[in-house]
Amino acid sequence: MLRFFLRYTYKPARILASRLPDLRNDLQKSNLYISAEGIIFRSMLFMLISIPFIVVAAYFLAQAGLGIFVIALPVAVVAPLMLMLNLPKISASSRSSALENELPYVVGYITVLAGGGISPFITIKRLSKADAIFPAAAREARRILLDIEIFGMDAISALEKVTKTNPNKLFADFIGGYVAVLKTGGDALSYLESKLKDIFSYTEGKVKRGSEFIGTMAEAYIIVTVVMGISLTILWSTQNLLGGISNGGVGGTVGLGGTQTLNASLIIMFSVLFVPVISLIFIIVIGSAQTREPFSFDLPFYVFLACLPAVAVCYFVPFGLPQYTQLGIGLAIASTPAAILQWRYVKHRKSVESKLANFLRDISEVRKTGLAPEKTIEQLAGRSYGGLSEHIKRISSQLSWGTPMRTVLQNFGASVKSWLTRAMAFLLLEVVDVGGGSTKMFTDLADFTEKNAQLQVERRSMVRPYIMIPYIGAVMVVMTTAMMLYFINPPGLSEAGVPALAPGSIVEKATNILLICSFFQAWVMGFVAGKMGEESAADGFKHATFLVVICIITVYVSFYFISGIKF
């Protein structure tokens, strides 16, 4: 069947490909290894496969009395074609983003090696083997080597091709300028150093723009979740607790037999479905504006999945506590182990990264005395470098035993869980292994590390204030719920002979429903706080736990001062 379909779609695919010249350019800039005709053929195949499903969907919609939605089904027929035609652009954007995150380190790597007299070809060859540290840059280097070693292009021509086929404009401009300097015989090292400064300036501007964007997203998130949640809580409480007055009752929605019922579907759907989906969208959008490392620490997520059944146990098993309190405790129990694991990882990573620039600067200064790199590290083993000290002492011990520098630094890179530290260890290894550990190369590496450390500190300080926004929002939701319940059924009405606006049983059920939704909503908002303020959703486990605990304390403190509400 596939051959039959290919026979009748090959010519239309070729005609369509000839009328879409940008498609070939997009494919060259993407990570897709397929021709323009091939991707059009696949899109037509997916269109053909989707037609029976769309016909069945149209039949069921018509039977359900939703025939108006059948009008939109033809759009679903062409959706596979539009998706496949835009797939190269999506892939090119992903390729560009991954390379841009590594670009300062890659340019710093090329600059350091160029300062030691290493040729561009050797630099590219060594970079192509750095998958463990710079996966995106290593793929780009292998593309260049493929043109040189397989297709017989010279190094300059292969680099010129990069300027036309690479989707990242910053990297393409860097390579284009580098090629121009090599062609004219200019000072390549001076160009690399100036370009490195430009890239740091660009990255600094990107960090500032990203922080402003995160601020805008934080305001939008508060409006969508907190303001809308408070408004919905007030409307729901008014409808369900006071609605019975218009029906001759004293509150609630009058059901069969004159009984009062609560319709909680809307408020539950908002808190359990709408808020998590919106939060996930905000996390993805915020992540697109943040600098991402090639590798991440995913163990907290697996620990959280293992602890997730605790939520069901605490919620459904009666422990003599209000149901919303049991849910809050269950959510806190589920996220606490992951929060502790992530906290320990972040603490260790920061303790190592904070002293890395000082260590490399001390190496460059001691190296000026003429000591060998191995002896230089041994001399620095007695100094205090925070969390980095234990690793330096281990490196010094291994070097004193005669272990080769390459093996020692590779073991060091494997023992730390910080990608930044691994990248710097890789650069240090290249300085010693390729450049012989010259004083200038150590100085260049130290300068680069200090600039990068300053940029990291500035980036964290600019986004950290946004952590408090979800905290304020979660407390507002809980406080609004408590005050709403107080105003609906204030104390002292019975003593004054005034009937209560809503029966105690209805108020108790409404309290349970509203606080269950508020606790879950606050817990979800903690992950957004982690992504906004610490650039990692895994840090959200800590904030989610804190928010649930704060909400529980807020509820009990509020109910202590607001009499007349059962909890």
Q: Model-predicted segments: where are they?
A:
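Membrane-cytosol interface segments
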Residues: 1-34, 255-260, 265-269, 281, ...
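Hydrophobic alpha-helical segments characteristic of transmembrane helices
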Residues: 1-31, 107-127, 151-208, 221-246, ...
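Helix-boundary and N-terminal cytosolic regulatory elements
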Residues: 13-64, 536
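Cytoplasmic membrane-interface regions of multi-pass membrane proteins
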Residues: 23, 27-31, 204, 208, ...
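Bilayer-spanning, highly hydrophobic alpha-helical transmembrane segments
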Residues: 41-60, 72-82, 205-285, 305-307, ...
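Membrane-helix interface and helix-disruption motif detector
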Residues: 61-67, 256-265, 293-295, 316-325
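Juxtamembrane/interface alpha-helical elements of multi-pass membrane proteins
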Residues: 69-163, 173, 309-413, 423-430, ...
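Transmembrane helix-loop junctions at the membrane interface of multipass transporters and ion channels
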Residues: 237-245, 288-291, 310-325, 529-531, ...
